[in-house]
Amino acid sequence: EIRLSLVGSEMCIRDREKKVLVIDADPQANASSGLGVNIKEVECSIYECIINEADIREAIYTTDIDGLDIVSSHIDLVGAEIEMLNLEDREKIMKKVLAPMRDEYDYILIDCSPSLGLITINALTAADSVIIPVQCEYFALEGISKLLNTIKIIKSKLNPSLEIEGFLLTMFDSRLRLANQIYDEVKRHFQELVFKTIIQRNVKLSEAPSHGIPAILYDADSTGAKNHLALAQEIITRNSK
């Protein structure tokens, strides 16, 4: 999987003048825990901003990385999509929530769950571009076609400026024939849109949240941290052209 908390950390470390905001819109809260945030102690989260119209500024928490802030997830996000059904312009709520922050940060990274529910649709409607993670596993390519179809619909009806930032291969193990086959197939289909960076399987990244510190500060020399550093650099390079 891709860890946006790490990508954001690496962006700020690589370029000290960059300001990055991570929005954790996944109920599993991996981005929040990856940046040392205990969501049980959070008083204002992305949930309050979406459902209760809380000011986004009240939900922003500073992290231990200079220039990197986060709006954390909350367990109540699990039921948020049902609560959103009765709201006006429900697909555009997150876009409205994030609007005041667009000029405050160089990058806003929105972490979503893999499911194509209303929260993910909100994120795609609010975004300028989308990174598509491709797990090097059996049904990966099937999932891509569904997501691409959703992006096409959102682009035509909700967000005409939405672009594909790139396809990112994750959970890669070069020893597995299947992983290499998926890599070849994705590269053949999407060519220049595929990131040069590949995120390899890595255990160290999973250990950091249990220590309550950002993953990049837990083990900067791990393979996973180095992969995410390369990805951050690639994103910065692509966006500076």
Where are these regions (language model features)?
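P-loop NTP-binding core
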Residues: 3, 9-241
